[in-house]
Amino acid sequence: MQSGGSAYDAHGRIQAPLGTPIFECNAACMCRGDCPNRIVQRGLSAPIEVFKTRYKGWAVRATALIPAGSFVVEYTGEVITTDEAERRGETYDALGFSTLFDLDAASTRNGTDCEYTIDATYKCGVARFLNHSCDPNLRQFSVWVDNVSLSLPRIAFFAIRDIAPGEELTFDYKYAEGGRNLACHCGAKNCRKWLY
């Protein structure tokens, strides 16, 4: 966190407010590997699995209780420039899918253009299969570990409430409103009916 304190509590659960940049301890720190400010860099430890859904394709679900505030998974893939993402995005749109995730934390904070995007099409982790929900149980945070460039955060997903075993893991894609191109199948009571 910017204040110099840990973004996590004693149980390793996020305590930083949404939108707060998270700076974890790294190779430049004198602390040990078990430092409580080294959560995302330890990797996946949440009890999750990939499964097939009826309407949304592949998805991810909890296999055991995930307590609120717990780190769940990092969105990984190939880091590309935004210009390359625009080119690839046209192809992906024509094919009816996209696994592009803009690394726009710095641009959102300082009003500049987003420089990089993660493409999880060919190189990816489990987070590629997280689906949208209008009432999500995960929220993404920008996390910096060894790379201090504000343009290159890591994207980490944390539970925003307790997640029951068998429950699908979701986040809000936050697509721009106005279009009516892809129906939403999240099933939430507050469903907006359309992704974009």
Where do the PLM segments sit?
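Accessory low-complexity/Zn-finger-associated flanking regions
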Residues: 1-58, 183, 189-196
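Short, Lys/Arg- and Gly-enriched loop/turn segments at beta-strand edges
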Residues: 79-85, 177-186
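Beta-strand-rich recognition/accessory modules
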Residues: 153-158, 168-176
